[in-house]
A protein has these predicted regions:
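A charged, aromatic-enriched C-terminal amphipathic alpha-helix characteristic of glycosyltransferases
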Residues: 412-416, 426-461
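N-terminal subdomain of nucleotide-sugar transferases
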Residues: 2-99
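Helix-loop-beta element that forms the nucleotide-linked donor phosphate-binding surface
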Residues: 204-205, 210-211, 216-253
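Nucleotide-sugar-dependent
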Residues: 285, 347-356, 361-383, 391-400
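Conserved donor-binding/catalytic core segment of Leloir-type glycosyltransferases
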Residues: 258-285, 291-295, 314
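Membrane-proximal helix-turn-helix segments that form the acceptor-binding/catalytic region
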Residues: 66, 153, 160-164, 171, ...
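Nucleotide-activated donor-binding/catalytic signature segment of Leloir-type glycosyltransferases, i.e.
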Residues: 305-308, 315-317, 322-355
């Protein structure tokens, strides 16, 4: 009997010891306060920023990192390191990148039957990588700033890691994960309902919340019932998005792009208009709207409105539906339905993308907003470069970003988009009016928005 009790005690003590040994180290504010006395080496705060996605394609989270570092904080940026990050990120000694391991290639499949098998394995792999990064690969931090969506499994893992490491959790709401899932499955699907419950449950563990619109803040307060501070933090362009006022500089840059080679003569003659659209090639951006409008524009330019200028549409971005649309565009070109329009896709460096926006005639946003209360960052960047915008406007938060007829115009169909293109390209004075409004909007900058809201919360302003 005694030997049995001793054995049980041994196993229990071993299990407890192992558990304590495996617990992640905790943030100690007293130790941090002692370090802060030596201002020459100690940061004002320490922050982990988590992006369950490609860091290079998450501009807002990169801007958070740069602002924290500018204020004297230390940042550990956690996410997939697939695309080129902002050059100031990689050169800043106060910012380090902890790259998440990509999914093993054998788990990546388009086969629906294999997806049912590999799907749970991919989620399990993701959970392990997230937990390992948040709990063991990084030092404990005062704050953990998490991008949402994606919410699964991010919010649960982040909540647990924050609790165990004595870290304050902040959720930066870009949209709602369950509304994006509903685009594919429908509002009543069990997975959508579970996703909504999950999101509403785990977000309650956050110390504070940032969100991209006032409308989103209202939903978080009134429908999610959150009592922690909810701070609307509107997107604003980073400093490298600036207008180019010299037309010869604009023209010179456009001529340097490989994408303009087929229409260089038209560009030099001034009979070409360049439009730019940045898309994620996903279900919440109906690219067929733009294709249809451009086909109809080409037809008008060939028939009843021969004075319309030719158009070069430069499309940037990566995503799952890209190849599908490229095949569709190729067929339309072969059929002669885009004779007055040239469509080119590209992926540019951060600086070249900013210069492209500053040199183009119009920006196009196809973002339809699954929730109705998020806003497209791409429009913010366009305004930063002084580029007027035509965008899908059938959602609640659109007026928080675009002032109709002042810095851009909204549309709700390909026909309305076509009407705007024809009107603006037939009447240069109207285009110049909204360009002036966009350049005025470019004066509103990220740091001006960030400092009194996020900077104040983090103790950096």
């Amino acid at each position: 009997m005694i030997e049995s009790l001793i054995s049980v005690a041994f196993y229990i003590s071993t299990a407890v010891t192992l558990l304590l040994f495996l617990l992640p180290s905790r943030y100690d504010p007293r130790r941090f306060d002692r370090l802060k006395k030596d201002a020459s080496i100690a940061p004002k705060t320490t922050t982990q920023i988590l992006v369950l996605g490609d860091i290079g394609r998450s501009p807002r989270m990169q801007y958070h990192a740069l602002s924290i570092a500018r204020g004297g904080g230390q940042v550990d940026l956690i996410g997939y390191n697939e695309s080129e990050v902002h050059p100031d990120i990689s050169s800043n000694p106060r910012i380090s990148i902890t790259a998440l391991a990509p999914h093993p290639t054998f788990l990546q499949t388009s086969n629906k039957l294999l997806f049912l098998l590999f799907g749970p394995l991919k989620v399990a792999f993701q959970i392990v990588c997230l937990w390992w990064a948040l709990a063991y690969r990084t030092e404990p931090a005062q704050w953990l700033l998490v991008q949402n969506p994606p919410s699964i499994p991010t919010l649960a893992i982040a909540s647990m890691a924050s609790f165990l490491r004595h870290t304050k959790l902040i959720i930066d709401w870009h949209n709602f994960g369950y509304t994006i899932l509903a685009l594919k499955l429908g509002d009543r699907h069990p997975l959508v309902r579970f996703s909504k419950w999950y999101e509403k449950s785990f977000c309650r563990y956050a110390t504070a919340h940032f969100c991209v619109t006032e409308a989103m803040a209202s939903i978080l307060k009134n429908h999610f019932g959150l009592t922690a501070p909810i701070l609307p933090l509107h997107d604003r362009p980073a400093s490298h998005f600036q207008p180019i006022f010299d037309q010869s500089e604009q023209k010179s840059f456009l001529e340097s792009l490989p994408e303009t080679a087929p229409v260089k003569d038209l560009l030099q003659a001034g009979s070409l208009r360049v439009i730019v659209s940045s898309t994620s090639w996903t279900a919440d951006e109906d690219f067929s709207l733009l294709i249809d409008a451009l086909c109809r524009y080409s037809n008008l330019a060939n028939t009843s409105k021969p004075a319309l200028p030719a158009v070069l549409a430069i499309i940037t971005g990566k995503g799952p539906q890209k190849e599908m649309y490229l095949k569709q565009i190729s067929k339309l070109q072969e059929a002669g339905k885009l004779s007055k329009v040239t469509i080119r896709t590209t992926w540019l460096t951060t600086d070249d993308y900013a210069r492209l926006l500053a040199s183009a005639s119009l920006g196009i946003s196809l973002h339809t907003s699954s929730s109705g209360v998020d806003l497209p960052m791409k429009v913010v960047d366009m305004f930063g470069a002084g580029l007027p915008v035509l965008g899908w406007d059938r959602f609640q938060a659109w007026p928080e970003l675009v002032t109709e007829g002042v810095n851009g115009m909204g549309f709700g169909s390909s026909g309305e988009l076509l009407d705007h293109l024809v009107d603006l390209f037939e009447n240069p004075s109207k285009l110049e009016k909204i360009r002036t409004g966009a350049r005025k909007e470019s004066n509103r900058r990220w740091n001006d928005e960030w400092d009194p809201i996020a900077g104040k919360l983090l103790g950096l302003a």
